[in-house]
């Protein structure tokens, strides 16, 4: 950083001083952000130490008498519960009737002249049965001829999930669902099994998970990969993940690899598909291979490898994400505060982009053709005005400043940010992909890194089926249980059309694996 003397500063003109002050403000904000982050980390560490100290203190304490509770009622506003909501929440669950009666002797004393029974008072409570383990003991009946001619006949038996293994479809489905739906690492599941007297090591469970994905569930994944190409628009994103072993070679501290995600744009008559694709790098070869037979538009966050693919192929377009264009302005406003940001370039940019996006949202219920028409009529000039304004402001400020970098992102992405104007199928943002990859990033916080490249590939398949199942509103455990029950029985089939009957939106799956999730 160049340091100017007092004399040099006195000789500078007003414009130069404005540029220097603007640059110093940006540097100050950046340093403040770093300081806040460091303080937050320190605070988290202190909280963890306090929590550990408290746990040790509690463990060493003598049991004390439970204190009496004095109820204090504080008047507050409570939203009135919708009539029948509890009944709706409990509907469809298995029910058991618990009768509360009086004995004939008690009734005879109270009613010496006889009695009649009135309608019972009915109320409901929710009961839970913790995990229950049952041993399936199979008895395969064997028959022999009475003539002792050596003929022996066995009853047919279903094919095992794995040879000489105690694993059942329901058990493996529960493990997969725990890890990939509920972000519960295998180590924690192993401890939970142990508390129930079941010894299942993490290695055993990991082998079951990888084999299930590789041998059986990959068939569904491959079919979904074929079907996602039917979409006109695919959203794409990627997120890093560390892998400890690549092709059996152990890497100290793990290798930084990437989990790519692809999600189709669901319009009327289409089914949502979410596909994860693990790859050892962020190289353009990976999306090139995944999208090799796709023709249409890919919505991304501006990563240049997608732009490279679009330049290679005439049948592939790339659309930008306006939320990514708006985000740095929003972060700047948050860092300095709303009051300070009033009238700033960041506030003006944020307002202009937000207005365009809000207006586009009003076209959601229109047909593709009508949406394109309205965008051309209503939004085209506003988009033109935004880019003209951005270029003008960029020429007036320090290019390396926070706002300068935010403006240049929009300017560099202009070609891709404009694509939505000419295609009613294309949205203004890449939210589909960001929402699809979020469960993976949550799970990653728990498992930190993946043990092997085989495990990473299996994880891609399993996250794909979980997120596609959720998007199609089916129960993920029931779905995995069905798949692991049915697919092994078809492994010798040359005709793979049975797979379509097991896709998340098939009538059979929708009937057998309904989700009880209700949108509030």
Segments the model singles out, each with a brief description of its role:
Residues 1-166, 206, 235-236, 242, ...:
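Short, flexible loop/hinge motifs at secondary-structure junctions
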Residues 2, 50, 142-144, 149-520:
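Catalytic center-proximal scaffold of phosphoryl-transfer enzymes
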